[in-house]
Amino acid sequence: MYMLTIGLLTALGLAVGASFGKALGVAVGSYFTACIIIGIIKGALRK
């Protein structure tokens, strides 16, 4: 489930990056990645 979500958010980040420019795209991609990692860590800690 996580892999599917990561894939979708990565694709979304790349699409946004292609639309608004590489620098902003990298920032958006990094932000999404950080959110995903934090979410996985929080989910793992709850179990």
Swiss-Prot record:
Superkingdom: Viruses
Entry's Gene Ontology cellular component terms: host cell membrane; membrane
Cystine crosslinks: none
Membrane-protein topology: Single-pass membrane protein
Signal peptide positions on this chain: 1-23
Keywords per UniProt: Host membrane, Membrane, Signal, Transmembrane, Transmembrane helix
UniProt-annotated location(s): Host membrane
TM annotation in the entry: 24-43
Major localization listed first in the record, in broad terms: host cell
Protein name, UniProt field: Protein 0.5
